[in-house]
C-alpha cells in the first residue's frame, strides 16, 4: 500500500461525513451529464472506500440513493475504477453545495464561506486530498505533497487555505490544470494534522527521523574514513622521508629531539598525531609533534 493510499484510508476509516468535504470531492472529481430525466452527476475514483464514502454522504445529506458502478482500466495499470452516479436532485445538490456555477464556467474558485472558516477549510482540504491529493513516500527522502486542480484559481484557493494554517504552499500551472504543493517535511506533517491523519503523521515523522539518523551516521563514517585516509597518506609520506634519511645519512645523525619521533613513526605507521604525542618518552602536544615531523620532512627534501 502506498503512503498516499494509507493516508486516505485512515481518513475514510474515521467515518466522518462532512458537507464541505463532499463539496471538494464533487468539485474536483465530479462531472455533470444530461439524461431524459434531467441532470446527472458522476464522481469517479479508483478508491473503493471513497466510493462507498460518497454513497453514504449522498444518502446522509440529501437522501439520495446513488449507484456505484465499476469497470477495469485498459491501460497498463489495469486499476478498477468506481463511478458514483445519481440522477436524483442533482440541481438542488449543486446549488446547495455552491457548485452549480463552477460546472457552467462561471465560478471555478473556492467559496468565500469556506475560505473564511477554519473548520470548513479543514474539511475542504480533507476532501480535496481525498479527491486529487498525493504524498510522495517519505522513504524516498524527497518530500512532496500535491493536490491537482482543473482550474488555476481553484489551485490558488487551495494554497490560500493551506497558508491560513501557516503552511508554505505554492502553485504550479501545468498544460492541463494546476497543482498546489508542499515540499517541506514539516509542512506535510502539519497538513496531516490539519486533515486528522494522526497515524500517518506519526509514520511520516518516524521514517523521516530514521532517514536523518542514517544520513548522520553515513556522514560521520565518511568523515572518519576521510580522516583515516589523510592520516595514512601523511604517515606514508613521512615514513618514506625517514627511510630516505636513514639510507643517506643515518637516523643517528638527526637531532636527538627528532630521532625518537622518527623511530615511533616507522614503528607505528597507523598512529594518529595524538597517539604519537602520547607515546613519546616526554609527551608533547599535537602541534609539537607536527613541528618535529615537518622538520624531518624538510631535512629529507634537502638531501
From Swiss-Prot:
Protein name (Swiss-Prot/TrEMBL): Probable cell division protein WhiA
InterPro entries attached here?
Homing_endonucl, Sporu_reg_WhiA_N_dom, Sporulation_regulator_WhiA, Sporulation_regulator_WhiA_C, WhiA_LAGLIDADG_dom
Keyword annotations? Cell cycle, Cell division, DNA-binding
Chain's gene name: whiA
* Gene Ontology terms for molecular function: DNA binding
**Does the record carry DNA-binding as a key word?**
yes
Q: Which organism is it from?
A: Streptococcus pneumoniae serotype 2 (strain D39 / NCTC 7466)
Residues in the DNA-binding region are: 272-303
Which HAMAP family does the UniProt entry name for this protein? HTH_type_WhiA
Biological process per Gene Ontology, one example term: regulation of sporulation
Q: Which SUPFAM superfamilies match?
A: Homing endonucleases
Q: Which family does it belong to?
A: Belongs to the WhiA family.
